[in-house]
């Protein structure tokens, strides 16, 4: 069903989808039917009526207007002052309580009873330092700043979910925590939110990201590893500078660095399990300016990605060992920094199997016949600081919301100056996010689980 949907919309099937998507969707539909019956008997919220609410002209127009306002005034990491003000104004209009500031410009709102269980929904707010090239009415009005990763859509969808939840607050069997996070693009926003206590006592969290690889109306995820852990490294290799005509009188760091680059490739091809995907990529190689001078030192750097915490730590250790040892072969010293420029090390994003089953069933029920649900996406080597929430909360799940619209030319990947979101996707994200939280609370109450923490 997922592939048929993509073809019908003129979109090529995304390369990371498995061939058994049809089987998965059939299974999801059966689970959704079961969940719908249970939800009806329990009087819980959710279902296709939530999507109908989000797609009503007034509601959809409001969401589009919010996104356009955010898109026109993009703000970089931890500079989201106006975006945060807009979020708070919308929450005020809904009558939703919130806490601000959190992690600088972040906002933490709550809807429901104020008592456990607590389930969180997260969206990021920051833009990228790049010039928008899309010519449209709501193009960025700030030079060299652009929402090229869809965070304007994420923030809008979470506000849409907040409105749905607030309208149905008397049905909630617990508390939904809404996280409007700053600083995702620099990789430190989530950790600062955690350190500020934003997810204290939260037992489950859901996050999402728009994807131009999925057509509008399609959502997808997978259990287990979804996004890679990400690290960066920078090494300064130092030798002895001298005249290029007398290399014997020098200690050439360029030769040492060249062999380091080659040796690093062996970490994946000869040390990693072929069934465990890993990437080591050198992206920086900077040395002297004069063509007749052997420089004193050279700086190299790059990134590494892996899908397990164990593999991540092992690869990090081996990168440093190889750089130092290989440099020493050519009489050079090497210093390796894994935090250059304040870059964090991000763990892999690993989805709870139980929450993924919940996602599949709720998505099929909520989005109904108007959307395909993809349950077996391939892992992606991209990374997300949502993984930091995953380490702080007992259960977590991250998924993708399709925004591809070939008829409108909305096909450019994130971080492209031509990237643009299909506004028709906003109701899908808002409705699904709200339904995931409502159904989760319903399920937890029916389970009769213990709640040692009585307040968030």
Curated annotation (Swiss-Prot):
Protein's GO biological process: auxin metabolic process
Keyword hit for Protein biosynthesis: no
Entry-linked Pfam families: M20_dimer, Peptidase_M20
Key words of the record: Endoplasmic reticulum, Hydrolase, Signal
Signal peptide region: 1-42
Known EC number: 3.5.1.-
InterPro entries in UniProt: Amidohydrolase, Bact_exopeptidase_dim_dom, ILR1-like_Hyd, Peptidase_M20, Peptidase_M20_dimer
Cell compartments where the protein resides: Endoplasmic reticulum lumen
GO cellular component term, pick one: endoplasmic reticulum lumen
Keyword Endoplasmic reticulum appears in the UniProt entry: yes
Gene3D superfamilies named among the record's database cross-references: 3.30.70.360, Zn peptidases
Chain location of the short sequence motif Prevents secretion from ER per the record: 453-456
GO molecular function: IAA-Ala conjugate hydrolase activity
Protein family: Belongs to the peptidase M20 family.
Functional summary from the UniProt entry: Hydrolyzes certain amino acid conjugates of the plant growth regulator indole-3-acetic acid (IAA).
Name under which the protein is recorded: IAA-amino acid hydrolase ILR1-like 2
Organism: Oryza sativa subsp. japonica (Rice)
Name of the gene: ILL2
